[in-house]
Amino acid sequence: MPKPKKGARFGGSASHQKAIFANLATALFEHGRITTTEAKAKAVRPYAEKLITKAKAGTLADRREVLKVIRNKDVVHSLFAEIGPSFEGREGGYTRITKTLPRKGDNAPMAIIELVREKTVTNEADRARRVAASKKAEEQAPAAEAEEQAPAAEAEAPAADAAAEAKADEAAEDKKDA
């Protein structure tokens, strides 16, 4: 039989904690960023990211699952129409937590949790690097084949040697141009 996790819950009871997370996630999707305590921000992060992952899929079943948690239909619509598709190329990491100054009244550690809107530069750079490497490998493969064929051609005929050298020179020039 599964046992509940030990330790205090936000709000005291399980139902109150569930309501707190639902309200925090609703506010996050509605406004894009919220200021809350550091503990609540860290706790609501996986909760919100799972909802965004469901919004990325965009199926009717996923929409109904999200509606069980977030009761505001306008927020659910914006989650599925705008927020989910904007994270289409990203595999997780939809939110960012930034620590801020402590709260004035009780000195509680505060944080801002926000949706990450900008595209990742590293993914685009990695993709460009992989494309360049694959093009370079494709260009080197015909040149390597031409070099392998050249020794066999030398043994057969000297005329074939000149043709192989011409092919290798053309491949080298094409590589320089690219």
From Swiss-Prot:
GO biological process, one term: translation
InterPro entries named among the record's database cross-references: Ribosomal_bL17 (IPR000456), Ribosomal_bL17_CS (IPR047859), Ribosomal_bL17_sf (IPR036373)
Region (Disordered): 126-178
GO CC, alphabetical: cytosolic large ribosomal subunit
Comp. bias regions, Basic and acidic residues: 126-139, 164-178
GO MF annotation list: structural constituent of ribosome
Residue ranges with Low complexity bias: 140-163
A Pfam cross-reference name: Ribosomal_L17
Record keywords: Ribonucleoprotein, Ribosomal protein
SUPFAM superfamilies, sorted: Prokaryotic ribosomal protein L17 (SSF64263)
PANTHER family assigned: LARGE RIBOSOMAL SUBUNIT PROTEIN BL17M, RIBOSOMAL PROTEIN L17
Binding partners and assembly: Part of the 50S ribosomal subunit. Contacts protein L32.
Similarity comment: Belongs to the bacterial ribosomal protein bL17 family.
Protein name according to UniProt: Large ribosomal subunit protein bL17
